[in-house]
């Protein structure tokens, strides 16, 4: 199981990469920003296996980005914390950069955040 161990690197990018550098972490946060809250929603949206999702959700809780509510329920919701919501501008910048540089000429990048999430 993945656990969160804060980086001791003096570089702020290295510290952020320690937490956010995992592909699943970014996609879980993306879907949480778009309204996913329950374990099954993340499984369905991401196609992630249950063990990987369980470990990433635990890691995001340890890091203070998600809160499980209620803590001991099998039907718990995973709620974004203020610390996680502070990442919205980072995701907006990442989406803008990707749209400008990773899509072929003439290829339309989806809007971020989607209009349905507004």
Indicate residue ranges for each PLM-predicted region:
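Long, low-complexity, charged/polar intrinsically disordered regions in eukaryotic proteins
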Residues: 1-9
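N-terminal helix-turn-helix DNA-binding core of bacterial DNA-binding proteins
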Residues: 9-52, 74, 79
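Basic, amphipathic "hinge/linker" alpha-helix immediately C-terminal to the N-terminal HTH DNA-binding motif
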Residues: 21, 72-93
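Alpha-helical residues within the helix-turn-helix
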Residues: 44, 61-62
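Residues within the DNA-recognition helix of helix-turn-helix
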Residues: 56
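Amphipathic alpha-helical dimerization/coiled-coil segments
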Residues: 88-118
């Amino acid at each position: 199981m993945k656990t969160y161990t804060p980086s001791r690197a003096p570089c702020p990018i290295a510290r952020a990469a320690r937490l956010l550098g995992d592909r699943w972490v970014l996609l879980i946060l993306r879907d949480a920003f778009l309204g996913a809250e329950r374990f099954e929603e993340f499984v369905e949206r991401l196609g992630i296996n249950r063990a990987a999702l369980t470990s990433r959700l635990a890691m995001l809780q340890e890091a203070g980005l998600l809160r499980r509510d209620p803590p001991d329920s099998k039907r718990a919701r995973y709620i974004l914390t203020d610390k996680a919501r502070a990442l919205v501008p980072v995701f907006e910048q990442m989406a803008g950069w990707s749209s400008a540089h990773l899509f072929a000429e003439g290829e339309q990048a989806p809007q971020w955040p989607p209009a349905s999430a507004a």
